[in-house]
Amino acid sequence: MGAAVGTVLLPWRGRARPLFAEASRPVVFTDVTAAAGLLPATNVSGSPDDKQFILEEMGGGVAFFDYDHDGWLDIFLVNGSSFDPKVRDSKPTSYLFHNNRDGTFTDVTASARLLHSGWGQGCCVGDYDNDGFDDLFVTYWGRNVLYHNNGDGTFTDVSDKAGVAGSGTCWGAGCCFLDYDRDGHLDLFVANYVNFDPAKAPRPGQSAYCRYNAIPVPCGPLGFAGGTNILYRNRGDGTFADVSEASGIARPRGPSSMVFVSSNWQPSGSYGMGAAAADFDNDGWPDIYVACDSAPSLLYRNSHDGTFREIAVPAGCALDENGVALAGMGAGVADYDADGWLDIVRTNFSEQVTTLYRNHGGGFEDASIRAGLGVNRKYLGFGVDFFDFDNDGWKDIFIANGHVYAQIANRKLHLTYRQPKVLYRNAGNGRFADVSATAGAAIRAENLGRGCAFGDFDNDGDVDVVVNNLDGPPTLLRNDGGNRNTAILIKCVGTRSNRSAIGTRVKVTSGNHSQIAEVMSGSSYYSQNDFRLHFGLGRSTAADIVELAWPSGLKETFRDLAANHLFVIEETKGIVNSRRFGSR
């Protein structure tokens, strides 16, 4: 594809002097769940106190996305079901909350026609038909669902027509839209976890794989056969073709039958959980990373010809520094050390270290311990991502924690069932400091955290967090104080590229400090972040240079963009709208 270069000079402000200094007062996160009206959205995932199966433990994802394009982030919370007939027959659904622009949300699930009930798992967002409204994909144990956004506040289930419902027998986990062939139409990747059948699965304590510290617990994933990942190619007519085999995504392959292997267990399939697509090797093509549970994680490198090669082991992002496959849960992607290469953070099981894979351009290295992430080993992490919570220009890390075994809740162990969240601040020198103790009571509050998403829901210039908690209401964490430093938000709109601009890379430079970010669909644990890219600017009054590389190959440059503004940039048309933070 040919690359055009356009430079636009804008009279926003004079060139700024960045001062990436630490704020004098700590940034705190305030739990505004009740005030925002989100308390009724209680998660259902089997029996809260007597879980018998692994399916009941995993919880669901969450999305920050602007479904009605009014400029304000709405919230979608994935919900599960139950094996209790009374609960199952009540048909619990996922939730969609509309942002009222005043700090509150309204439940619009019914009016939006999002009433599918089942064992919901993950979600991802992308405008697959390029009509200007972002569509929603939800994974399930069972039939997956693609909701077409009708543009009038309602959605239509087009899963069967589009050809992405799946077999109805798989356990869909993380997902992401991506334009892997760069034809302008969003394709879809779905990770499948394990082959699970409650009629065949043993109960707690019935196998060596069903005990934890000698306590009978639900079985898995060890002993279960892993699932097979799926890649759907968008035909451009509203339908998708399953190209998993032809593209190489179906490897490693799991068995077709839903079996539990009680002895002589060997990993088979992927055991895929969190998934994220981004350009890890800076060749202009999206690759796919999958966090895998108790098996080597996967990195599918895009070969530019419609196929992928799985290279995680030689690339250095499959195992930990000791060559051990950890129990990967969620995955976040960003350039935390500002060297121009996208890095990966992955949550793991309790008594394992959250893994930080530093991308050095020739592959990845496990930088977890020297970066300071080894201080918290007793937590079981799920949702995770990089975000700049204090607007100092460096990507920090947030982790939503919570154990999976309800059976340990009343035991006097070194571990707890409900767990606090963790916030790491990036020191700008390759190391992180745990600042959870000073980040507010809401961070320290103990929950069963699962999926989490990041975005500026109140449009005040700092990044907020929403967490989908197992067996309870979500937690909406408002960032209070991050905007004492300045920032800009960049919303990209594709024309030659896909309309959601997924895969667009943006580079922002202030003074001698540069940051990169990509528009991504799906990351964290089964979740979707705000498509608008956030760049903290410290004390700068403007971003000196903003460079965009679109999936189409077009490159555009803008100069002197005022801080504390949202800029909407449309491919080939430049800045089509701007708005100061705090305005409506």
Predicted regions and their residues:
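Short, conserved, GDST-rich strand-edge loop motifs in beta-rich repeat architectures
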Residues: 78-91, 194-223, 400-416
